[in-house]
């Protein structure tokens, strides 16, 4: 079974969105300028793996709204994005954003399901111990 591991919330104005999530929920917002992306840290995170310490908790991100992400998106971790893109197409879904490398963390793609909902796929890259 594949689990939800991340979320993304689009914004139109980054400063306004950052302030909202900091002030309302107490989230820590970290900017990744090379990707124009903001990590939304919602729980204590292991500094080595960047994964939440609390079982069942997830962190996420804030990003500029675009055509593939007009609404919040959940990311589901899969062992192979390529295999899941094929499964999605075979089951009536569509690829809306091709696979891209995200830093040295993993691979990411966006798909739509049979109902038009956009979902992110995440393939984690194994980090050296």
Regions found by a protein language model. Give the residues of each.
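Active-site beta-strand termini and strand-to-loop segments that position acidic
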Residues: 41-44, 111-114, 124
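Core segments of cupin and vicinal oxygen chelate
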Residues: 8-56
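Conserved catalytic-core motifs of GNAT/GCN5-like acyltransferases
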Residues: 28-34, 99-102, 126-129
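Short acidic/glycine-enriched loop/turn segments that link adjacent beta-strands
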Residues: 34-37, 68-70, 102-107
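Vicinal oxygen chelate
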Residues: 12-14, 74-118
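Short, charged/polar surface micro-motifs in flexible loops or helix N-caps
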Residues: 44-47, 67-69, 80-82
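N-terminal beta-strand motif that seeds the catalytic metal site of vicinal oxygen chelate
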Residues: 1-19, 71-74, 123-129
């Amino acid at each position: 079974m594949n689990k939800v591991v991340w979320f993304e919330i689009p914004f139109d104005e980054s400063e306004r969105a950052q302030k909202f999530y900091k002030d309302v929920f107490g989230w820590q917002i970290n900017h990744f300028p090379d990707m124009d992306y903001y990590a939304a840290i919602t729980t204590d995170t292991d500094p080595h793996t960047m994964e939440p310490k609390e079982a069942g908790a997830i962190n996420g991100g804030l990003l500029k709204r675009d055509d593939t992400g007009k609404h919040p998106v959940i990311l589901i971790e899969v062992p192979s994005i390529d295999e899941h893109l094929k499964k999605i197409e075979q089951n009536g879904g569509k690829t809306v954003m091709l696979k891209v490398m995200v830093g040295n963390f993993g691979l990411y793609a966006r798909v739509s399901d049979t109902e038009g909902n956009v979902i992110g796929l995440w393939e984690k890259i194994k980090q050296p111990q």
